[in-house]
């Protein structure tokens, strides 16, 4: 039997294949201090504490098209060997309460391709359904991963 709290949590996984090698993709993705390079919803990013490694906290201001203006995010895990990054949203003026994402990067079966898998869990805000919350978060994550793919592939063309 689910508790009241469990009924108000949702999550999803978004997968993106990128036509670029893992080291290139990871070098862009792992930059906790500079998400603006591929996240188009980010207007500015400033480290509030830390040096960009595990435990660092960043303040991200977002573009005016979103129903928020800023987010406080903590880097919970950054594993350069396993290519895993875990980020938690710990504050802000948005509805993504208790949001935590885990992004894992793999070498694809096809040569020179990379697979990025981002999964998340988040509280469902009062007045919203799981479907609405998942659709919103999936849209943001999907846009970010497509942008990461586009940037990585463009950088490949330049090499």
Curated annotation (Swiss-Prot):
A motif (Latch loop) lies at residues 94-96. Residues 3-153 are annotated as: START-like. The record marks 67, 129 as: Involved in interactions with PP2Cs. A motif (Gate loop) lies at residues 64-68. Abscisate binds at residues 39, 68-73, 95-101, 118. InterPro entries: Plant_def-hormone_signal, Polyketide_cyclase/dehydratase, START-like_dom_sf. GO terms for cellular component: cytoplasm; nucleus; plasma membrane. One of its GO terms (molecular function) is signaling receptor activity. It is found in: Cytoplasm; Nucleus; Cell membrane. SUPFAM superfamilies: Bet v1-like. Pfam families: Polyketide_cyc2. Keywords: Abscisic acid signaling pathway, Cell membrane, Cytoplasm, Membrane, Nucleus, Protein phosphatase inhibitor, Receptor. Its main location: cytoplasm. Belongs to the PYR/PYL/RCAR abscisic acid intracellular receptor family. Upon interaction with ABA, the 'latch' and 'gate' loops change in conformation leading to a tight dimerization and the creation a surface that enables the receptor to dock into and inhibit the PP2C active site. Receptor for abscisic acid (ABA) required for ABA-mediated responses such as stomatal closure and germination inhibition. Inhibits the activity of group-A protein phosphatases type 2C (PP2Cs) when activated by ABA. This is Abscisic acid receptor PYL12. It comes from Arabidopsis thaliana. The gene is PYL12.
